Amino acid sequence: MQPNFEIMLQYVKCLIIGSGPAGYTAGIYTSRADLKPLLIEGIQVGGQLTITNEVENFPGYPEGSSGPVIMEDIRNQALHVGVEMRPGIVTKVDFSSRPFHCWVDDKDEIVADTVIVATGAQARWLGLPS
């Protein structure tokens, strides 16, 4: 008897890969443009800002704030304007022809007219004493 693997195929106008400030902002603007974006959250939901204790000079926070608070506010705004969010990791993307084909968690396939890659960066610590 073979295992039952359920594979999903989904079409979207706009797929956003990444859930940091750039991903959520892309979601907000593409949703307002009626592109009905799907945002795949990735490994670290909220990006590096979620591990930042103090953020200064960020628009809308004249007194500063913590990274997690800012990211929660941006995420809530994205949800409010209709961004669909889904957990998972995009494991493969085929940009060779349109529409683009993307795979999430090595199984679910998403076909998208537009793909926005907002995967952010990863901190590389120098290992210097504090």
Residue ranges of each PLM-predicted region?
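FAD-binding core/adjacent interface of flavoenzyme oxidoreductases
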Residues: M1-I17, R32-A33, L38, M85-S130
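Glycine-rich NAD(P) Rossmann-fold beta1-alpha1 loop
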Residues: G20
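N-terminal Rossmann-fold NAD(P) dinucleotide-binding loop
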Residues: G23
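Gly/Ala-rich phosphate-binding loop of Rossmann-like dinucleotide-binding domains
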Residues: G27, S31
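Short beta-strand "acidic-cap" motif of Rossmann-like dinucleotide-binding folds
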Residues: K36-G42, L49
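Short glycine-enriched loops at secondary-structure junctions
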Residues: I43-V45, Q122
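Short acidic/His/Gly/Ser-rich catalytic and metal-binding motifs that mark active-site loops
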Residues: G47-T50, W125
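N-terminal Rossmann-like dinucleotide/flavin-binding domain of flavoprotein oxidoreductases
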Residues: T50-E109
